[in-house]
Amino acid sequence: MKAVVLTLAVLFLTGSQARHFWQRDEPRSSWDKIKDFATVYVDTVKDSGREYVAQFEASAFGKQLNLKLLDNWDSLSSTVSKLQEQLGPVTQEFWDNLEKETEGLREEMNKDLQEVRQKVQPYLDEFQKKWQEEVERYRQKVEPLGAELRESARQKLTELQEKLSPLAEELRDSARTHVDTLRTKLAPYSNELQQRLAARLESIKEGGGASLAEYQAKAREHLSVLSEKARPALEDLRQGLLPVLESFKASVQNVLDEATKKLNTQ
C-alpha cells in the first residue's frame, strides 16, 4: 500500500495524458477507462462462459450427466448483473473520492506537461511542415511517371518500377533524416520531463511525508468503505449461487448412484 495513490496518479496521468499530449485530442478520465475496461471484461467472461457451458452440455458426457447448467447459467448471469447494478454507485463513489484526493498532484503534473508541450510544439510543427514538403515533392516526381504508365502500361511497367524504386528510397531516407532530427531536438525536453517527474515524486517522499501518509490513510479508508458497502451485494451473489451448486451436486450424485448400481448388477 505504500504509494498506492502516487502509483495510480503517476501511472494513469502520465500514461493517458501524455498520449493525448501528442495526439492533441481531449483526454478521457482515467477512472472512466478503468470502469469501461472492467465492464467489458465481465461481459466477455459471461458470454464466453455461457458458450463453454453450452458446448459441454452438447457433448456426450454432458448429456450423460444432464446437469442442466445452461438453465442455471441465465439465473447466475442475472444475479451477477444485479450485483453489478448494486456495486455501481459504490465503486463510483470510491473512484470519485480517490480522484478528489489526487487532484492536487494531477494539477501539478498537468502543468509540467503543458510547459514541455509549449516548448516542443515548434519542433512538431516544423517536422510536419518538412514531411508535407517531402510528400509533395515525391508526388510531383511520381506524377509524370504515372502518365507514362497510362500511355504504355505493359511495355513500360518494368522501367517504371526501376524509376520509382530510387524515388521511394529517397523519400524513405528523407523521412528517416527528419525523424532523427526531431528525436534529437526533443531529447532534452523528454529528459526535462523525466527529471521534473522524478523531482516531484522525491519532494513528496522527503518534504511531504505527511501528505504521503495522508494519501495512504485515505486510500485505506475508501477501500474499507467500499468493502462494507459491497458486502450485502456479495451475499446476494452467494445466495444466488447456492441453487446452482446444489443442482450440480445432486446431478453428480445421481450419476454416481447409477454407475454403482450397474457395477453391482454385473
Curated annotation (Swiss-Prot):
Gene Ontology CC entries for this record: chylomicron; extracellular vesicle; high-density lipoprotein particle; low-density lipoprotein particle; very-low-density lipoprotein particle
Sequence repeat start and end residues: 67-88, 89-110, 111-121, 122-143, 144-165, 166-187, 188-209, 210-231, 232-242, 243-266
Primary location group: secreted
Modification after translation: Glycosylated.
Described function: Participates in the reverse transport of cholesterol from tissues to the liver for excretion by promoting cholesterol efflux from tissues and by acting as a cofactor for the lecithin cholesterol acyltransferase (LCAT). As part of the SPAP complex, activates spermatozoa motility.
Subunit relationships: Homodimer. Interacts with APOA1BP and CLU. Component of a sperm activating protein complex (SPAP), consisting of APOA1, an immunoglobulin heavy chain, an immunoglobulin light chain and albumin. Interacts with NDRG1. Interacts with SCGB3A2. Interacts with NAXE and YJEFN3.
Protein name: Apolipoprotein A-I
Organism: Oryctolagus cuniculus
Phylogenetic classification of the source organism: Eukaryota, Metazoa, Chordata, Craniata, Vertebrata
